[in-house]
Regions:
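DNA major-groove recognition helix of helix-turn-helix/homeodomain DNA-binding modules
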Residues: 47-62
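Short basic helix-loop element that most often maps to the first helix and adjoining turn
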Residues: 6-25, 76-87
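Recognition helix of helix-turn-helix/homeodomain-like DNA-binding domains
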Residues: 27-44
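Residues in the recognition helix of alpha-helical DNA-binding motifs
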Residues: 11, 25, 36-37, 66
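Short, charged recognition helix plus adjacent turn
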Residues: 54, 64-111
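Helix-turn-helix DNA-binding elements, focusing on the entry/boundary residues of the two helices
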Residues: 8, 19, 31, 46-49
Length: 111
């Protein structure tokens, strides 16, 4: 099992919230789910991540830095590989795709 760095516990305690209160605020059924998120045992769904961002006023990169770094690295590696794929002719669609792939590094979240 891979553990991930998370700052949920720090933020929850900073604001004086219990795990049960955070669970209620972010729409999960139990404090056990919040505990698993805090310990880095489980990753949040997109909905839970958005709720945590709203609750604590922090970005995904601030709450889950390792997850964001891994996702960015994967996308950038695959984008670079796709740009290196041999292309006999550049259709308009392929040109648009290459434009998108070249822009990916500038979209990375710097932490």
């Amino acid at each position: 099992m891979t553990f991930i760095v998370t700052y949920i516990r720090r933020e929850r305690r900073k604001w004086g919230l219990t795990q049960r209160e955070v669970a209620r605020l972010i729409g999960v059924t139990s404090s056990a789910h919040v505990s698993a998120l805090e310990r880095g045992i489980t990753r949040p769904s997109a909905e839970v991540l958005l709720a945590l961002q709203m609750l604590f006023g922090m970005t995904a990169a601030q709450l889950f830095p390792q997850v964001v770094q891994r996702a960015q690295a994967k996308v950038m590696t695959e984008a670079a590989a796709m740009l290196d794929d041999p292309i006999p002719t550049m259709s308009l669609r392929t040109q648009r795709k290459h434009t998108l792939l070249r822009q990916i590094p500038s979209r990375a979240i710097m932490s």
